[in-house]
Amino acid sequence: MQQAAPVGQNEGYELQKQIRRRVYFLSGFDPRGAAFYYRLFAGQLQTCASRQGRDLQIGRRRRQPDPLLSAWQVRECESGLLAESVSLEVCFLHWDDIARQNWPKNPLRLIWDGVGIYGWYVLGGGLLRIGRLAPAVALGGLWPLLFFGLWLVLTLTAAAGVATGLQPLAGLAVGAAVGLVLAMALAALGWKLAERLGVVWLYRSIRFTHRLGQARDAGLRQRLGALAGRILAMEEQNPAAEVLLVGHSSGSFVMAMLAAQLRREPAWGQSGLDQRLRLLSLGQNLANLAVHRQATGFHADLQLLAQEPRLPWLDVTSGDDFLCFAGVDPYASCGLPCQGESYPVLRLIPLAQRQQLSNWWALASHQFDLHFEYLRTAESAQAGGFDFYALLLECHPEEIRP
């Protein structure tokens, strides 16, 4: 198999080649951009193809002035010769810059924002609403509050103990000064530990979703309008035979918002995408946004997607993943009526076996890494009936058809 070429060049990207399948991918709330996901996809595609005895050429990531997407192409090699058509084109849809804009690094600002967030969560009914749908997710939402609350108690107890112990020996002023220095050191240590454990990342994601839930989504809505226009233009200029819109983690509700925006576009009816576009959500947390009563724009998006003719939508989650709403109907989560057959199609898969996590502690301590297992390939015996990259490389992925 040919190795993936270095990132950032145009070689290996051909604009007018016939494309069998184009994937538009939305990452979760992640400041890492296309370069990270290019390396992830390239490595996993290579591993999956090797397992199948296939030879692929994974092209370089296309350098382009368009800030909306980054693209790379995958072509089959047969007897050392490249196929004429492109087997797969991956388009990374950029909203990572919005994640970076909503990634404050000042601890004091984050703590101050937490007052309103956890006021709503604990006292405003958020915890109960989410707890009815997914108890593990509800407890996960409390984790930043519990971590920093316990660390604060530890810090104050240690600092007060040292200050009190030193007072008879060195006086009140010295004892207080040493206690203050210790408190500051422990606070800094706690913050670094929280970042290492992913607590701060989780809290930033909660903060962003809460802001969207308060209808503070103008920047994201503007981006979605631009992305919808870009997708329609691409599918008019060089249409792919099959189109897949994929959202991972928080990217799942962005995916739903974008799919609805596409349907609102005047060019939608002439694009032919209603016959070619399919939706795939991985490790979704749609209900994290849907439970907010002020998220009326998102509720309208869901209602539009439920209207006939519906876009085929497969939702893949796992009960082992405490950061997703495993098997939760996004429409039921916010009380929206959804007539007819269940929508989206919900599929639960096991993930713990992929990492040989055999007990609760091992499972709980690997949640952030496990949440990315949807974006990794696996041996068939461990895949739990779903392999994202095997699906992308299939000639006819029946499981995402109506």
Question: Which residues make up each language-model segment?
Answer:
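N-terminal low-complexity, Ser/Thr- and acidic-residue-enriched intrinsically disordered segments
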Residues: 2-183
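Solvent-exposed, charged interface segments at domain starts and junctions
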Residues: 2-11, 242-248, 328-329
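Contiguous N-terminal and early-domain "leader" segments and peripheral loops that mark the onset or edge
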Residues: 2-24, 197-219, 260
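Serine-dependent carboxylesterase/thioesterase catalytic core
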Residues: 22-23, 27-45, 213-323
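Lipolytic serine-hydrolase domain surface
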Residues: 31, 97-98, 108, 113-116, ...
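Active-site catalytic motif of lipid deacylating hydrolases and related acyltransferases
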Residues: 31, 86-147, 168-239, 371-402
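Enriched - but not universal
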Residues: 75, 154, 279, 363-364
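Intrinsically disordered, low-complexity coil segments
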Residues: 78-84, 236-240, 265-275, 334-349, ...
